[in-house]
Amino acid sequence: MCSPLPLLILRLLLLTHPSLGRHLRHRESRKIHSVVVSTWNYTDANLQAWSVLKQGPRRTRQAVIQGCLACQNLRCGRLLGGSYGPDERGNLSLEAAIMDGRNQKFGAVAGMEGIRNAILVAEAVLQHTHHSLLVGKGATDFARVMGYKEEHAVNLNTKNVIGNWTFARCQPNFWRDVVPPPRTQCGPYSPLPQYLLQRPMRQEYPITQGEHDQLAFLALDSEGLIHVASYSSGARFRLRGRVGDSAVPGAGIYADNEVGGAIASGDGDVLMHHLPAFLAVEAMRAGQSPAKAAAKVIQRVLKHNTEFNGAVIAVNRWGTYAAACAGMDEFHFVVSGGKGFLRMARVERVKCQDRKDVVDGGPKGFFTRKPMKNRKIE
């Protein structure tokens, strides 16, 4: 027979602390709102992911995979899955990743040439290996073992893109501290002598609405299960062998069922410096709202990279979501589901933070220092 002592203690606590009872009732009654969130304004792909999620519980993995496949087939952002995003040598490659919020298991591929369905290969890494990331030829070999056929994707479009880029003196590119000067001339390049190295300056990778090389999806179901996924054709004119944020856990995607998840998009090399998706989830773990977590992450990135272009979307375990961004007037993302919404695949917009409100001088000194009386103390 159970002792009545624990029940008596609980009753005493409820009598002396009424707020505890309200808190417990709130926790018991709080509902998880299923939601699919994706970066940028591609509604069809988000709707396809939602159509999978609403079929029933435990469909989050297939939902985010379907979203990535839809964008690949629909050529979301023109660069994705097509022939318009080559590296500087004219090669086409893909990267993709998926993470399970139950245990943070992660599968990814990067720099994978000749294979079209990168997100399915990333899922195969998760399911059929003890590894987290396969790159380059090794990723292609693994895809063949998994039954995926190689395709020669380079075509006339790719050759035209490279031809126009070369005619424009290989601008933009991702070289620095080399000769000849990479901002005015094409390579081949060689390192500058040490005594000629200049103060580090970075030509920020531009982001234009409708011209994206990366997309990310988050799916949360009514049981609180979360999966996140990302898919990218890589920054145009990148160096061959470059790995982007899509394939790095915590940079483009991160999820923990106990807290929530986050997805990010923007300059991948900067995102890999700071792991904003991971930081957003940890901020929510510390008690911050999705809106506060996303804003704080963007502020942190800006303080170290004053010209950063990008965004992060944070979603807590209940389905509340928010986004923050920098480097654009506003950031668009698509949401299906969530609390109190009937219309699916709705495009939501968030006004981006003004750099000058965040950066006080900055490591590169792009902005005039604010007067001391106006400085915000955190």
Curated annotation (Swiss-Prot):
Disulfide bonding pattern of the chain: C71-C76, C170-C186, C325-C352
CDD domains tied to this protein: Glycosylasparaginase (cd04513)
GO MF entries: N4-(beta-N-acetylglucosaminyl)-L-asparaginase activity
GO annotation, cellular component aspect: lysosome
Keywords for the protein's UniProt record, in alphabetical order: Disulfide bond, Signal
Domain of life: Eukaryota
Annotated signal sequence range: 1-21
Entry's family note: Belongs to the Ntn-hydrolase family.
PANTHER family cross-referenced by the UniProt entry: L-ASPARAGINASE, N(4)-(BETA-N-ACETYLGLUCOSAMINYL)-L-ASPARAGINASE
Name of the protein this chain belongs to: L-asparaginase-like protein GF11609
